[in-house]
């Protein structure tokens, strides 16, 4: 099997192996605030008696126990396995933090999100992305490639990136 991007293949295979997922997938991306926004969203859904789980910097919550994680955005096998578990437990809302590394490394490929949230963008991770443009493009993968048709994008209209986000 010849493939230019084995990480993308791994994500697609994971999505096919672990087909069952919660009904509503929500992703949060941005330089700062991913964890806070994911946690706020989690608490709002939980307070409204929705079954919800959250994946990110704080680990995986919403299962019987909180599982710790080493990356903000898990590897595709762990994502698939955990989403499959949540669906079996009838948890139908999952919030995932989508880091620029995770997006650029295709860890979320094969998933389709109902809601995408963009918090902000500032100069960070340029050791990995090299330019601010590359960093922004990594964040935009969520909105360009991983959203369901008719999905919801949430972002600050006053951000200088609002025009770009509106035109996706």
State each model region's role.
Residues 38-42, 83, 166:
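A generic structural signal for short, well-ordered alpha-helical segments in conserved domains
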Residues 13, 28, 55, 79, ...:
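Residue-level signal for inorganic ion chemistry
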Residues 1-29, 36-53:
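Short, basic phosphate-binding NTP loop
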Residues 66-76, 124-129:
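Flexible beta-alpha connector loops of hexameric P-loop NTPases
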Residues 71-99:
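Conserved nucleotide-sensing/catalytic segment adjacent to the nucleotide-binding pocket
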Residues 49-64, 99:
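Short beta-strand-centered segment that lines the nucleotide-binding/catalytic pocket of NTP-utilizing
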Residues 1, 88-92, 104, 113-168:
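Acidic, Mg2+-coordinating active-site environments of NTP-dependent enzymes
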Residues 101-109:
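Conserved helix/coil segment N-terminal to the catalytic DExD/H
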């Amino acid at each position: 099997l010849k493939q230019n991007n084995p990480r993308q293949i791994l994500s697609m295979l994971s999505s096919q192996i672990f087909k069952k997922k919660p009904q509503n997938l929500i992703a949060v991306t941005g330089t700062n605030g991913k964890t806070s926004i994911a946690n706020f969203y989690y608490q709002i859904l939980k307070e409204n008696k929705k079954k919800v789980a959250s994946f990110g910097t704080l680990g995986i919550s919403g299962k019987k126990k909180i599982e710790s994680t080493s990356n903000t955005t898990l590897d595709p096998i762990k994502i698939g396995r955990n989403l499959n578990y949540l669906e079996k437990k009838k948890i139908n809302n999952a919030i995932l933090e989508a880091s620029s590394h995770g997006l650029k490394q295709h860890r979320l490929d094969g998933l389709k999100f109902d809601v995408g949230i963009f918090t902000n963008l500032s100069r960070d991770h340029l050791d990995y992305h090299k330019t601010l443009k590359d960093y922004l493009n990594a964040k935009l993968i969520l909105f360009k490639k991983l959203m369901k048709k008719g999905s919801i994008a949430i972002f600050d209209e006053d951000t200088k990136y609002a025009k770009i986000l509106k035109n996706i």
